[in-house]
Amino acid sequence: MKRLFLVIVLAILTMAAIAQEPYKAYCEIVGTGNITGTKVKIEVDFGQKAKWATPNARFLVDENGEKMNFNSMIDAVNYLAKLGWELILAYPVTPTQGMSKDPVYHYILCKKVTSDEQIKEGINLKDK
């Protein structure tokens, strides 16, 4: 009986040691509007490795591979909140050069995960 109890306790301790502690993963979403100002395109940066031709340019796409347009940045945040992301910080950056003086919105989000595979769960990305 003592041996069985010892085996069970060791099995439980082993499983507890294997279980990973959740950690926070972060991403940045950058929103840019179109000419009509009616929709926002969202670029996502998970800190992924940059590609030579399109460094860190990743847009949210639907199941058909089409770029997703959102009504506003909050619409995009709500979409990501359904996937477990939480808004941490938001700030605008206004261009100082060029024709457009419209601000580009940057939002920082975080999500608790236990593996890197969970970071992009439910999110489809496509280069520009």
What is the role of each PLM region?
Residues 5-6, 18-128:
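Terminus-proximal functional modules
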Residues 10-18:
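Hydrophobic h-region of N-terminal signal peptides that target proteins for export
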